Amino acid sequence: MIGFAPISAPDALAEAAARARQDALTKPRGALGRLEDLSAWVASCQGQCPPRQFQRARVVVFAGDHGVTRSGVSAYPPDVTAQMVANIDGGGAAINALADVAGATVRVVDLAVDAEALSEQIGAHKVRRGSGDIATEDALTDDQTAAAIAAGQQIADAEVDAGADLLIAGDMGIGNTTPAAVLVAALTNTEPVAVVGFGTGVDDATWSRKTAAVRDALFRSARVLPDPVALLRCCGGADLAAMAGFCAQAAVRRTPLLLDGMAVTAAALVAERLAPGARQWWQAGHRSTEPGHQLALTALALDPVVDLRMRLGEGTGATVALPVLRAAVAALSSMATFAEAGVSTACDDAGATEPPES
């Protein structure tokens, strides 16, 4: 049985206190821009003002292969997925380097890599070897879909129970932007050509094959809409279903989460339908160059923290945003107020509301 506990909203009183404190800090009102909004969001998620600095930020990378790669939709062969799982586990991937700088740790989980699991721990939630070719068949069976969503829930629970106070969802899977594009197109009523990007750097011919595969899968998806579970079964994959479960359960557990790029945000779009209101607990770490990513962000009403023209996946874009989130927390919690510092506020009699930039 697939189900999530009702989502409760972040703490509105803590958010209000954070905004009031921002206005009292030794700076012009609003001078820290988006950092002020982010700090208020963290305070609301933690239910306290000032908020605590993150002590255990955790990146979870969900890995899986996709049968649609047989249609030639990617610039890389499918066996790269298994090789990259080993690379991430060994600490040699981009996500490892960026997480180290950002003060986060990394875990990789194998949901549907088309190879034997690298280790018992990595493969503890493995659902199958490779998801089906969504252009011609369902990605998963009913039981596999339920198992993958449950795996995401269990992984989120395990991380929060172990002390994680911020979660980042990442992905690893050759060809996974193809099912991700289908999910976004289906849930935003968008044509394939508007959601399909160049992924890992495909050429025009590969893009055309990818668009055709998305078109065929989207046609198949029409019979299951608007059921989010059936959509994952039909046109998703075990990794995407697990990410959806993970994102939704993070919200159930009242734990803030940073979304990464196209694959993760497509899964989050489904997660919002599995657990309405979950998006209140998420921030979009970055904006990918994949066109479907902006469509998904718009549908979720999320603004990216950074935009660095990244399109790697793995959780890298979200992890780059983590230091920005840390800076937001530090400013709100560590700065002095005007009263504490003995600094004069804006001159009311002169009609000024803010001192000029120095």
From Swiss-Prot:
InterPro entries: Nict_dMeBzImd_PRibTrfase, Nict_dMeBzImd_PRibTrfase_bact, Nict_dMeBzImd_PRibTrfase_N, Nict_dMeBzImd_PRibTrfase_sf. It catalyses: 5,6-dimethylbenzimidazole + nicotinate beta-D-ribonucleotide = alpha-ribazole 5'-phosphate + nicotinate + H(+). Pathway: Nucleoside biosynthesis; alpha-ribazole biosynthesis; alpha-ribazole from 5,6-dimethylbenzimidazole: step 1/2. GO terms for molecular function: nicotinate-nucleotide-dimethylbenzimidazole phosphoribosyltransferase activity. The active site is at E314. HAMAP family: CobT. NCBIfam families: cobT_DBIPRT, PRK00105.1. Belongs to the CobT family. This is Nicotinate-nucleotide--dimethylbenzimidazole phosphoribosyltransferase.
